Amino acid sequence: MAAAKDSHEDHDTSTENADESNHDPQFEPIVSLPEQEIKTLEEDEEELFKMRAKLFRFASENDLPEWKERGTGDVKLLKHKEKGTIRLLMRRDKTLKICANHYITPMMELKPNAGSDRAWVWNTHADFADECPKPELLAIRFLNAENAQKFKTKFEECRKEIEEREKKGPGKNDNAEKVAEKLEALSVREAREEAEEKSEEKQ
């Protein structure tokens, strides 16, 4: 009897195992969401430089002004394909939150930070990291002196390019707009003169 009972229990157990092995639940999402295309505004820009670094800002608004870390990530120099403007953009790792976003201008100058050969300090009159533009004193630190020098070299190239571009005056788009304005003014003047001539003929 004991043997029969054991064999019955074994049979039940094997049946349960069979049921578990055959159980293959399929979970379907209740609501299917379409994929959203995420735009970073970098699609219209050419990447001139990219390197990992750590960024700081000088918190002068504090009672005791000090350097505060803004984040670690890739710093980029991006040139707009149509406008020709160049900006510095840096996002934090993982969160991708912007910690620096400003245009390169001819007046910007990189200076060594406390004599370090792998860090630079500079001023910007309008940093858009917090969406609202505001002046900032920023510092950036690289892994080594070689990387820091590569950044400085490319930064200076961009600064000089913007300086030369401003010396040449307005770009093609600006000139095209001015030509269109002149043509419009000319058309208005011609129409006015034609109306005056017709008025004189009637008299």
From Swiss-Prot:
Residues 1-26, 163-192 have a biased composition (Basic and acidic residues). The modification N-acetylalanine is found at residue 2. The modification N6-acetyllysine is found at residues 150, 182. Residues 1-33, 163-203 are annotated as: Disordered. GO terms for biological process: nucleocytoplasmic transport; positive regulation of mitotic centrosome separation; spindle organization. The modification Phosphoserine is found at residues 21, 60, 187. It comes from the Eukaryota. Plays a role in RAN-dependent nucleocytoplasmic transport. Alleviates the TNPO1-dependent inhibition of RAN GTPase activity and mediates the dissociation of RAN from proteins involved in transport into the nucleus. Induces a conformation change in the complex formed by XPO1 and RAN that triggers the release of the nuclear export signal of cargo proteins. Promotes the disassembly of the complex formed by RAN and importin beta. Promotes dissociation of RAN from a complex with KPNA2 and CSE1L. Required for normal mitotic spindle assembly and normal progress through mitosis via its effect on RAN. Belongs to the RANBP1 family. Interacts with RAN (via C-terminus of GTP-bound form) but not with GDP-bound RAN. Identified in a complex composed of RAN, RANGAP1 and RANBP1. Identified in a complex that contains TNPO1, RAN and RANBP1. Identified in a complex that contains CSE1L, KPNA2, RAN and RANBP1. Identified in a complex with nucleotide-free RAN and RCC1. This is Ran-specific GTPase-activating protein.
